[in-house]
Amino acid sequence: MPTVRPTMIHLAMALALGGASCAALADGVTRDGAAFQGRQASISTNADGSFRLAYDGGTRDIATQPWKTTTASPLFDGLFAMAQADLAADSVKAISDPGFDHGQPIACDCFVTGEKWPFVWTRDLSFSVDLGLWRFDPQRARNSFAFKVSGVRQPGAGDGTYVMQDTGSGGSWPISTDRVVWFVGAQHLLSDRAFAARYDKALADTLAQDRVYAFDSRLGLYRGETSFLDWREQTYPAWTKEDVTFIAQSFALSTNVLHYQALRIAASRLHDGNDYAGQAAALKAAINRRFWRDDRGMYMSYIGGDVEPAPFDTYDMLGLALAIDSGVADQARAKKILANYPVWPAGTPVIWPERRDQPIYHNRSIWPFVSAYALRAARRADAPAHIEHEIRSLMQGAALSGSNMENFELVSQKIHVDEGPLSGPVVDSPRQLWSVGAYMGLVVEGVFGLEPDDTIAPKLPVGLARDLFGDKESITLDTGTRRIVLHKPNGMEGNLLVTDRRKISGSTTDIWLKATTVTDVPLRKDAPLYAPDAPDAPEVTDKGGSDSVLLPPGGVLYVNGVRAKATTLPHRDTAQCVSVTIEERGLESLHSPTRCLGTVQTLPGEGPWTFTPSHKGPLQLRVSYENDNGPVNTGVTAAVRRAQMQCEGAAVQTEVIVMAHGIRRQVSTPARFDVPAHGSCTISLKPGFNMSYLAQFAHYTQAKGGASGPLDAARVFGASVMPLP
């Protein structure tokens, strides 16, 4: 029989009886259990060092593991063992997915993404490893990363080595462009020379390719979808469900911070004549200039529009945490972000505000891996209340569900809430790899302070420390080859425990802690849950010489990405692109669809198109097309073209356009050119590059562009050009 404390016996009996007698337990995490909104969990330690977790879903026996913690909290120690057990289950000899090799196993000593996701996905793997999995099985991590990098199979498309952007919105890259997260995760594994050589080759080639196809030199930002938040209408306006062109031409905080991190890595590793350090510095400045909102004290999740990017009153914790951890946000902004981004008793939402009309998945949810990045950000900002909040949220979620789950509903921290069509989380996998990485990061870095560079810098909130130390004088992390021992201070008068002195003896590092008082960042608990619903496209009436825009109650008009006070717009030849939001309860909705007013020249046919521009100066090109080579939500066959404009007496200008998968005829992303003088111009479309060109996508069998061969195609019906202000 396992050895169980008397209090644990009572709790385990109550759980077995349905939990009725435990209703009086306070919500939260204790040393040996957790309770929240009537659900409870308890853990007991057996004589052999193994654990038994009892929770509403049953019991789970957890074997002893290679890495061990010794604290006064059986829950803390047992959940660390559970994370390692989950990692072992995610360590496989073969991977599979219905969309690849017809669902047949593909040999790979790899990590799978989770119980319900038995494949290797670029961003999931990369964030998981970056959070700490690289320490536990580095060779398996390298194998997994190697599966997500590829050469080129398309003749004439070069011989580069590129990171794969997984199947995704509108046909993948360059609509989604966060594949550079691969470098953030894989940077921890470069002690292997062969792996490091391929890493450097892929780094140089991928950054060069993204500079051509995703970088907007005028704004200084990279285009593309938010990292991780890739279920379009969950976080973008609902009208992007069937047309992702807006997403393709928009700019996301998280994706730009990941590019910043990749450029910083390149600056430290590559010596090929490119000024990566200068590019990184310029990108950091552009992020701070374009995404920061002083009125909110946070960076926006994304910005976008047809002429100039409009602000969107929406925020996501992954992007914010990455900005803090990477140094894009200085210490003052880091503290403002943590003070202004709201939390709920169960944890921190991945987006805010939530969408009233969307089911629970990214919307209205807690994702443990995002909470782990929030924990890392809180440590960078010396914010003990936030450090403790994230740690307790991660422990509570794992304990109450008996595994490191993919996600939780925000208010209840349940793995399913029944709300009819809004029920969710829509998908929720046990032993989700990045949730496993999150818990391991919580222990190794979040509590014991072991940083990626192997420095040890614990920052323990006093309230949490009392649970972990109890009557013990020290707590220990034992990796099998290294021991970290944290010694309790004589007093805990402050709010944060940090290093006082240290001693290294062989493989053991002793850290004596001291209590200090830092200026804490309070948890924001007063935020409204939902954003206002976004309005329909604006109604515009031609008044003869001017256009009148009808606003709904609470409506706010934007013209070319800027708030406009007047709703009557004098006719102009140059573009006036209008959208509307709703302000309510101090929040602003997402934008309506946009309507553009102005003089349009229509150019019929497939091109090339020769025309005489009506104005000199900036001009916008859009192409009318159909691309039904895959569904809107996935695939690898976004059509990509390099649009070239040659005007009389002027140099050739080249810009990239993207023609995403769609369900009807639609328009491409815009290309912006400068007309130097009046005269004839010719626009032609040249071949580009998409993910179907990568050799590794020969495994893809769900749709076109995979096993059937590379495909970068769309039916072009014509183009339009409009002068810009």
Name every feature range the model reports, one short phrase each.
Residues 552-574:
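Recognizes extended acidic, P/S/T-rich segments that occur
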